[in-house]
């Protein structure tokens, strides 16, 4: 198995990161919207930590819209994960 896939599966093993990723399947979100949308009781630094972990392994992409950081699913990585599970 590819090391990047291993890191992705490990990242999704955390309940908070899994919730973040799952919410992005439905819509793109600004980093500032996660705690409200997910109703998470976590601090901004903790949220940033989890978003960074998801970005580092390639599960999510970040784009800028002015001062806002917009997060979305990395479709290429999602497809790699699907291909792995369909083998």
Where are these regions (language model features)?
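N-terminal helix-turn-helix DNA-binding core of bacterial DNA-binding proteins
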Residues: 10, 15-43, 68-76
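Short, hydrophobic-biased segments on the C-terminal half of alpha helices
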Residues: 50-52
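Beta-hairpin "wing" of winged helix-turn-helix
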Residues: 55-65, 72
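Amphipathic alpha-helical dimerization/coiled-coil segments
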Residues: 1-5, 22-26, 75-87
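A generic structural signal for ordered secondary structure
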Residues: 1-9, 14-21, 54, 59
């Amino acid at each position: 198995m590819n090391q990047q896939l291993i890191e992705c599966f490990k990242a999704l093993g955390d309940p908070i990161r899994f919730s973040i990723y799952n919410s992005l399947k439905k819509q793109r979100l600004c980093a500032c919207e996660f705690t409200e949308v997910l109703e998470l009781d976590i601090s901004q630094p903790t949220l940033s930590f989890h978003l960074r972990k998801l970005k580092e392994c390639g599960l999510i992409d970040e784009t800028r819209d002015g001062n806002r950081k917009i997060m979305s699913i990395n479709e290429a990585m999602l497809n790699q994960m699907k291909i792995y599970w369909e083998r």
